[in-house]
């Protein structure tokens, strides 16, 4: 009997977790819920996608969510021009007391160069 109660409780908890609503990070229309930090790159929406336009010779620019998230699944496609170095930050922060608000934390590397480090994860700015 105890095993049945525990199993029933576990199944109920698992069903409750699966029933939670997903919250998309990007609505496909505008940058509501996002903010730009640090550099001077521009971001716009083209064909339901976020497009970043680099400003050569300026510090790294970060487009961040306005809200913090706990557990998440991040899926994305990317296109990048040759010669650029880019990435997607995850579990990163920007605090005034750390290098004047410099975004720091883990980055999923997007690297079209010969070394081809795309997919690598490194610690940005620390």
Could you tell me what each predicted segment is?
Residues 19-126:
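Carbohydrate-interacting regions of secretory-pathway proteins
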Residues 4-14:
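Sec-dependent N-terminal signal peptides
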């Amino acid at each position: 009997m105890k095993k049945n109660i525990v199993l029933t409780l576990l199944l109920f908890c698992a069903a409750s977790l699966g029933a939670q609503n997903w919250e998309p990070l990007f609505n496909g229309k505008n940058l509501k819920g996002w903010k730009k930090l640090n550099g001077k790159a521009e971001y716009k929406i083209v064909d339901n996608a976020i497009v970043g336009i680099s400003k050569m010779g300026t510090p790294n620019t970060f487009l961040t969510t306005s809200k913090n998230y706990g557990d998440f699944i991040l899926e994305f496609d990317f296109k990048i021009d040759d010669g650029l170095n880019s990435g997607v930050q995850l579990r990163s922060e920007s605090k005034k007391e750390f290098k004047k608000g410099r975004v720091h934390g883990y980055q999923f590397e997007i690297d079209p160069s010969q070394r081809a480090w795309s997919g690598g994860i490194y610690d940005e700015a620390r």
